[in-house]
């Protein structure tokens, strides 16, 4: 185990690129379309969330189960194995890894119930099948079970740089959630924020206890350039949390470091939050106007034959950007901005794909028939290849 993300197996062994993930789907694409393969990933992500919710497991377990499932199928095809059995096994293993163990009978019973509701009745009722699959799952993941999730980095950055940070208000998300936990708050924005605070604490983010990876997330801004992100308020934090939830329906957690995914969620959250987006747009327009005026004043000096070097020197300095501004915040990041833009684009593209596969995902029996068709096509192809091999021999 490691509290250092940079020394972890997740960083060194399990950051996959797009060609590696495409290679994993190569066999499936012989028997299904690319959109159908994407629908399978979203469908089983939804199933994992449903089973974890019914078993009263924490969000951390749900996130880990999703990562385990996608890691497994980054090495295997949907058509060669039973994704339903793998799905149930991922929940069972993730609960143990995240120190929220459940009995194997509960895992099998709840998985069987959820699968039946979605049209699949082939889940083995004996516990030995799930126990056996557990060993296959661990072996395929090379026993690398320690995970770093983006939620922790998001909370650390909110407390350090958000409008609700200790710098800004003196109250952390943990203090606010703890103080209001027994207040019986009703519905609405504050109630949702309290719920998020409790969920964050339950997720494992404890005040004053941060891993090295979380420290790196907080120090992504150069020490001399640290600013407070006023637009990063409670509403934006909630939106970022939901965005991170949605990333687990994609391969993003397998492709990028957690703190970069958290930063990308902040950018997307600010863009989707109308007041924050309007403020960013206004700031961009103001700065562009000031720069244009500055360049115009320099041009006037250069065009004036009577101007002196002292006048030019006094006008050379560019106007400084506002310190408490989202654009200034992201410009001061000590990270790769092209990589950040790439992750944001992946998130946007993922929402487009999820919208396209919505009809397929909502049809549980249709997904079951799709898998049966893929397996049958694979079986026929294997028999055909075997017969051809014998003929040539």
Swiss-Prot record:
InterPro entries: Cyclin-like_dom (IPR013763), Cyclin-like_sf (IPR036915), Cyclin/Ssn8 (IPR043198), Cyclin_N (IPR006671). Transmembrane segments: none annotated. Component of the SRB8-11 complex, a regulatory module of the Mediator complex. Its main location: nucleus. Residues 51-146 form the Cyclin N-terminal domain. Component of the SRB8-11 complex. The SRB8-11 complex is a regulatory module of the Mediator complex which is itself involved in regulation of basal and activated RNA polymerase II-dependent transcription. The SRB8-11 complex may be involved in the transcriptional repression of a subset of genes regulated by Mediator. It may inhibit the association of the Mediator complex with RNA polymerase II to form the holoenzyme complex. The SRB8-11 complex phosphorylates the C-terminal domain (CTD) of the largest subunit of RNA polymerase II. This is RNA polymerase II holoenzyme cyclin-like subunit. It comes from the Eukaryota. It comes from Mycosarcoma maydis (Corn smut fungus). GO terms for molecular function: cyclin-dependent protein serine/threonine kinase regulator activity. Keywords: Activator, Cyclin, Nucleus, Repressor, Transcription, Transcription regulation. One of its GO terms (cellular component) is mediator complex. GO terms for biological process: positive regulation of transcription by RNA polymerase II. The keyword Transmembrane helix does not apply. Belongs to the cyclin family. Cyclin C subfamily. CDD domains: CYCLIN_CCNC_rpt1, CYCLIN_CCNC_rpt2. Pfam families: Cyclin_N (PF00134). It is found in: Nucleus.
